Swiss-Prot record:
Cofactor: Zn(2+)
Positions of ATP binding: 87, 105-109, 524
Function: Part of the Sec protein translocase complex. Interacts with the SecYEG preprotein conducting channel. Has a central role in coupling the hydrolysis of ATP to the transfer of proteins into and across the cell membrane, serving both as a receptor for the preprotein-SecB complex and as an ATP-driven molecular motor driving the stepwise translocation of polypeptide chains across the membrane.
Naturally occurring in which organism (per UniProt): Beijerinckia indica subsp. indica (strain ATCC 9039 / DSM 1715 / NCIMB 8712)
InterPro entries from the UniProt entry: Helicase_ATP-bd, P-loop_NTPase, SEC_C_motif, SecA, SecA_CS, SecA_DEAD, SecA_motor_DEAD, SecA_preprotein_X-link_dom
Gene3D superfamilies: 3.10.450.50, Helical scaffold and wing domains of SecA, P-loop containing nucleotide triphosphate hydrolases, SecA, preprotein cross-linking domain
Domain of life of the organism encoding this protein: Bacteria
Gene name for this UniProt entry: secA
Keyword Transferase set for record: no
Entry keyword annotation includes Membrane: yes
The protein's name: Protein translocase subunit SecA
Amino acid sequence: MWATLAKKIFGTANDRRLKGYRPKVAAINALEPEIQKLSDEELAAQTITLRAQLAEGKTLDDLIVPAFATVREAARRVLGQRHFDVQLIGGMVLHEGGIAEMRTGEGKTLVATLATYLNALAGQGVHVVTVNDYLARRDAEWMGQVYRFLGLSTGIIVHGLDDAQRREAYAADITYGTNNEFGFDYLRDNMKYELSHMVQRGHAFAIVDEVDSILIDEARTPLIISGPSDDKSDLYNLVDTLIPKLNDEDFELDEKQRSTNLTEAGNEHIEELLREIGALHDGSLYDAVNVTLVHHVNQALRAHKLFQRDKDYIERNGEIVIIDEFTGRMMPGRRYSEGLHQALEAKEHVQVQPENVTLASITFQNYFRLYKKLAGMTGTAATEADEFAEIYRLEVVSIPTNNPVRRHDEDDEVYRSGEEKLRAITREIEAAGQTLQPMLVGTTSIEKSEQLAAFMLQQGYKQIDFSEPKALQKLYAAARSGKPSKLFAVLNARFHEQEAYIVAEAGVPGAITIATNMAGRGTDIKLGGNVDMRVEQECASLPPGPDRDAKEAEIRAEVDSFRDQAIAAGGLYIIGTERHESRRIDNQLRGRSGRQGDPGRSKFFLSLKDDLMRIFGSDRMESMLLKLGLKEDEAIVHPWINKALEKAQQKVEARNFEMRKNILKYDNVMNDQRKVVFEQRREMMGQDSLEEMIHDMRTGVVDDLVGKFVPHDAYPEAWDIEGLTQGLETALNLALPLADWAKEEGITDEAMHERLQQAAETAYAERAERNGPDLMRYIEKQVVLQVLDHLWREHLVTLDHLRQVIGWRGLAQRDPLNEYKSEAFALFDELITQLRETTTAQLSRVEVAFAPSADQSPFETLAAAAPFDPVPAVPPLAASLALEGPTETGQTAVSFMPQQGVEAFNGRDVLVAAEPTIPTLERNADDPKSWGRVGRNEPCPCGSGKKYKHCHGMIS
């Protein structure tokens, strides 16, 4: 009570924040008449004036008033749109690095121009991030008119651009693109071998559109660049045949936690089935040698019991395509990791693609935290304000609407079963259709949308076929006649090509649009229809002239008439068929109605069998409703139901927040190491010579060898001369008379150390002289970078495996996170040691084995042949330096191995890239000392067929 009273007297924190912006809004308005007097040339020259003021020492904050006034006037002249006062406030929130929560239809795209222009004046580049290529192109072309008028350059980053085009786009003052493209470019840049090949120029300021979708919904999705690994499709298909044979008592299913596990009986049953097909020979399923089988069984079990076709994924053209649980959109190119996607392919009997090995990865959480300043816009952020503040340090400011919201949100109706709910929804659609009220019916999955569509077809409705050229003419004709059309459109992942068109016409009187979740987000539903899209569709075949002008005028008049009809019918009616786990998604659905002061209404129809009610609702809810005498086809409507559902949603949101926080804690460990590796890489690429670093590495290797085989202050008789001889051969390619040295009178460990160091330096200097010092400097840099990349990839795999099993440490009363940090640090320390040893060993064997052309030096020939870029621009191929086995002279020759090009990148989550050729030494299967460092997941060099970690790796 006191909190409510205090809010009435003092206002909320949001109200006080808004009040602080009012003086600057007033100053911008006061400057407007003066700005309006400027000619187009004088207005455009404001950019030069403002940049000059920055150079003289003014800050961006000092320039808010003139900059915003300039953009407002430019938008009025170029677009015919003038920023409202509330939009000016939104621009200030973005400039300060906050999140502007603005309702649908309030002009977020236009608001972004204010902060974008102001920050672009600094010349460090501004990134405007959208959720898909369509919106990136649309916004760049639309708002780009304003920026170009003011003398700023714009670029766009979408799929299909080569590196030169990307570099040009990033060099622009303002760059539009999708979150995935920005993230993947960052990863690809950190796999380049020359600074000049990189495309991004830094991370100064980013404005993220639909910030909740990208930073909350996508937070758990890592961006992964990967390369193919071994083909195990037969094993996936084999294990897949066993899962349907399991009984209900063989596994436990937890829908809340999205997990499934075999019971003790299930373990025995699956072991029996595996033995029958010859996949399990000796011992238990959980013996170390069978760890791969356990992994395949677990993923197959998840694929069959947790993932549903047409809800979590669809089968399209022989491929499994993931469906975004929040938007209902397909995500082509994105694949589940850790073999789950392969298990789904086996389940649906399509070709099982090879698993991928991670080359580089980063989460959106960590990518967007690279920016010095980050801002965002969305229609719904208040429910996640705590998460934005805690994870990203972003404050959410709710911007008031320019016109009051006139949408009426009604209480939910709850029915006993799904069939009763469908009948109630159809009755509601029938009733609203009598007045030609446009309706948007939101569902949570493709399966649910098609279930409702099938039910409506049974009731005599007809589905609009958008493959027909004049698909909507019947709907327009019905609107003209004032009679219900009984036509409906379906928008889900199957019809995503027509998404913008279907959504644009959802505001036509009498239109019924069934959509999955937030499909079509980013496209406004305008009452009466979208006049521009309709003109484009219906006038496309008409040449410019009187006939086209007349047709366009006719369409515009009809759309205005339809708008009046839709308003008279009550505006857009949002019908929700199920509550989502997140209140934010429900609010987004409701927010499609009542844009810019239009009327509207919304209501959710629920059943006790809905997922949220069944999994997260109170166990007593169903029994209580039945005691109240709830009969068939009878609904209960009560504010208590809404509160109970909201509590269930809050529980789910809190759980998801904790999961994201926990993931971030673990990811931060890898992120800290990633920063070190990427910064070190960039520093090495920027140096002309790594001679000093290579010298330090060589010195470190000698120190390690002496420390291992020549104990300090020990007599020569105690030295391990045989071990030292082998160590020098492996690590430094040196054959020295160590036994004779050890017999010398008065020889000490310090003297031995000094001789070894001198011998290593002399041998390397001679090699550099033979190859040419300039060429050797070039080779040194490429070898160090390639070895670092190879070790980093293996390190990522090892960390991933560690993360999967570290949770079991909790059973021993040890904190898994601290254990993970400790072991990850030890592994990283080992990586540094291996980098030193492997680089030194490789460079000690380098010998150039080709003749340069007559007019080129060896360095020029090598540089021209091998750009050393493991992720080249598509489509050219790159050549990669490889170190072959010893030649007849006992040296290792440099050759040029053509490298596979990067496969066309269609996707969001995983880029399948060719794996760079890694310098390797010739290995003798019978001599483990010749193997060098073997990756834990590589086949054991002994030829057993097992992974190294399950063979000689266990011994070592």
